[in-house]
């Protein structure tokens, strides 16, 4: 089956049933060490994960690690340009769950990003990025502890699909000519819009299927959270991109109010029900005024639409959601993308799960990570219906490779996500406890040490940080 790999002689496969993992007590899990500092952070990660499993389960559960190759290491073993050997793809497909360090993409043509390629090959349509603050972590924000969110990012569509043509190419010229001549409408206000002939062109596909399966996972996750955190916010720029990001919002609401009707309430529905609860004699029109402050400035036609919305909500869900019942449901709302970047800083405790498209999610997850201490402590997971890959969210930092000084927190916390995905919560909790205690005790690597006040004079090595985490399992 494999050209150059030898799977572990013991262990069992993780399988998937209806999109959920079925995990044996001795799973075989492929790992990719990663390029650059992967040589340092993977051994530290393996040490911590193994120690947590041993401590939590006393030998009843055990991971059998299976080394596979991608990036620079793959080229060394399989030959030049073999950055994604078939062996590796076969192993991940066979064993279902994998973890990896950072990967770089060789300069030149071909695959633009190894990470994006993996997501597309295995249809890992959900990127999950938790942003949680560990007390003591240096942060530029005054109150980073208030931010505790999870970004759900659609992973397979949007401009990351890579359908684009460079300026001046035959494809760009043909597409621009076709759009200008055949598809771009003339409007009374602006006349005939035109794409400049010296433009590069990219396609931004957003599908109902892709949008709703992402929002479905976000809602299912929200249902598992404490009641105060059961909220999903649809993040979009639908006010400008009316046929891509606008429908993402609409399809998200559609899913929430059909498939999850008994378990979800939209923000506007909560206002309508809440208004009636406060004043049982409230008229439909008065309620409409309250949910739309600009009601009086609207045309009669638009006012009628809002009144119809109020009436429809009260007729359809009052029995199941009224009289305060909506407070026990998962709240689904939406926010404009540029606004949410501001609000995770100014009103961070108002949000829980942010569900969004690929590009927005890329920006948003990194911005949120900065609030709680940076990408060095930012885990990530890419999850589909038949596979899941957990990964470092930072780059390869080749200048630090082999120096045993880089922060392994991102991959270690990605390992925590993997353990939680597998249902091994006790081991995951031990690692989170160990990381929290190490940071609180100022036992940290240089990137955190140099920002702490007062400054830590002797930061730990990468390997020492891993050992410090393990030492706090018994605290």
From Swiss-Prot:
Record key words, sorted: Cytoplasm, Glyoxylate bypass, Magnesium, Manganese, Metal-binding, NADP, Oxidoreductase, Tricarboxylic acid cycle
pH dependence: Optimum pH is 9.0. Active over a relatively broad pH range (7.5-10.0).
Main location: cytoplasm
Gene Ontology terms: biological process: glyoxylate cycle; tricarboxylic acid cycle
Key word Nuclease present: no
Activity: how regulated: Inhibited non-competitively by ADP and 2-oxoglutarate, with respect to isocitrate and in a competitive manner by NADPH.
Record localization: Cytoplasm
Cofactor(s), names only, from the UniProt record: Mg(2+); Mn(2+)
GO annotation, cellular component aspect: cytoplasm
Residues bound to Mg(2+): 362
Keyword Nucleotidyltransferase: no
Thermal behavior of activity: Activity increases with temperature up to 70 degrees Celsius, although activity declines after a few minutes at this temperature.
Induction: Induced by nitrogen starvation. Expression is regulated by the transcription factor NtcA, a positive regulator of genes subjected to nitrogen control in cyanobacteria.
Description of how the protein assembles with itself and partners: Homodimer.
Family statement: Belongs to the isocitrate and isopropylmalate dehydrogenases family.
Protein name: Isocitrate dehydrogenase [NADP]
Organism in which the protein naturally occurs: Synechocystis sp. (strain ATCC 27184 / PCC 6803 / Kazusa)
């Amino acid at each position: 089956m494999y050209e150059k790999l030898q799977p572990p002689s013991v262990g069992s496969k993780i399988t998937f049933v209806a999109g959920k993992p079925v995990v044996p007590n001795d799973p075989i899990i492929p790992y990719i060490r990663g390029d650059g500092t992967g040589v340092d952070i993977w051994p530290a990660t393996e040490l911590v994960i193994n120690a947590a499993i041993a401590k939590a389960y006393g030998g009843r559960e055990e991971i059998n690690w299976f080394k596979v190759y991608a990036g620079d290491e793959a080229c060394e073993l399989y030959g030049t340009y073999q950055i994604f050997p078939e062996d590796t793809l076969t192993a991940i497909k066979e064993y279902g769950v994998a973890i990896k360090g950072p990967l770089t993409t060789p300069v030149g043509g071909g695959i633009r990003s190894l990470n994006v390629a993996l997501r597309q090959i295995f249809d890992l349509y959900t990127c999950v990025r938790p942003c949680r603050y560990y007390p003591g972590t240096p942060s530029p924000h005054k109150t980073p502890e208030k931010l505790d969110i999870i970004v759900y990012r659609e992973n397979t569509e949007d401009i990351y699909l890579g359908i684009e043509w460079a300026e001046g190419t035959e494809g760009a010229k043909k597409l621009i000519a076709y759009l200008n001549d055949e598809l771009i409408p003339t409007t009374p206000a602006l006349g005939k819009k035109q794409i400049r002939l010296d433009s590069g062109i990219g396609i931004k596909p957003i599908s109902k299927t892709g949008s709703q399966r992402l929002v479905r996972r976000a809602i299912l996750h929200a249902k598992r959270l404490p009641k105060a955190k059961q909220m999903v916010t649809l993040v979009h720029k639908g006010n400008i991109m009316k046929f891509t990001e606008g429908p993402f919002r609409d399809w998200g609401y559609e899913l929430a109010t059909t498939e999850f009707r008994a378990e979800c309430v939209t923000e506007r529905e909560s206002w309508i029900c809440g208004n009636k609860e406060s004043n049982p004699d409230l008229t439909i029109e008065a309620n409409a005024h309250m949910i739309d402050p600009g009601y009086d400035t609207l045309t009669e036609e638009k006012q009628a639409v809002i009144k119809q919305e109020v009436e429809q909500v009260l007729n359809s869900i009052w029995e199941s959601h009224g009289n305060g019942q909506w407070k026990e449901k998962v709240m689904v709302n939406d926010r404009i993308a540029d606004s949410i970047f501001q609000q995770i800083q100014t009103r961070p405790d108002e949000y829980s799960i942010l569900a969004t498209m690929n590009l927005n999610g890329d920006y948003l997850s990194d911005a949120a990570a900065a609030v709680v201490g940076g990408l060095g402590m930012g885990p990530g997971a890419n999850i589909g219906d038949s596979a899941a890959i957990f990964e470092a969210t930072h780059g390869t930092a080749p200048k630090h490779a082999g120096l045993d000084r880089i922060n392994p927190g991102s991959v270690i916390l990605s390992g925590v996500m993997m353990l939680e995905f597998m249902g091994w919560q006790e081991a995951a909790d031990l690692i989170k406890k160990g990381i929290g205690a190490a940071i609180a005790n100022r036992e940290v690597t240089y990137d955190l040490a140099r920002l702490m006040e007062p400054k830590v004079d002797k930061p730990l090595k990468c390997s020492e940080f891993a050992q410090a985490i393990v030492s706090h399992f018994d605290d």
